[in-house]
Amino acid sequence: MQYQEFLNLTAEKIAPGTASEVRKFIAVTLSTLGERLYRTGRDELSAQLPKELKGDLYLEVDGEAVRTDTERFPLEEYYQRVAARADLPYPRAVEISRKVMEVLAGAVTPEVLAAVKSRLPEEYDQLFGDAPDSPTSPTAV
């Protein structure tokens, strides 16, 4: 998938939003995912993303991507980080995160997506739309 197509599909799914807001939401969502993945997962995923999005999976210092160790945090914290970084209410951060992941799922091969998901705790299936919200899910509240 090309960069502009990724942006356009994301914009359609998360409307309303300006082009710069959509780009910010993608960057925040992918960078937060990148923090949760081990380097091999980030590398596999970034290899299939448009070049303009590759750096979003890595911490950047002075414009250069820096590989970091993974951080282990639950799905609720993932959504909280997205909400804080994108200056969004929590429910909107959940919605946008899921929509970006929906576009991401169409941008990479099923094998890479499965490999990435296998490296995350089961609760992250909700992020990818593969599991319903449970009664104790932060998104069900």
List each language-model region with its residue ranges.
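The feature marks the first
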Residues: M1-R39, E76, E102
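Extended intrinsically disordered, low-complexity coil regions enriched in Ser, Thr, Gly, Ala
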Residues: Q2, R36-A65, A107-T139
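Generic alpha-helical secondary structure signal
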Residues: Q4-E5, S20, D43, F73-E77, ...
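Generic signature of intrinsically disordered, low-complexity segments enriched in small/polar residues
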Residues: F6-L9, V28, V61, R81-V82, ...
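A domain-level signal for the structural core that forms small-molecule/cofactor-binding pockets
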Residues: K13-A15, A19-V22, R85-R98, E102-V103, ...
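Short, solvent-exposed interaction modules
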Residues: D56-E111
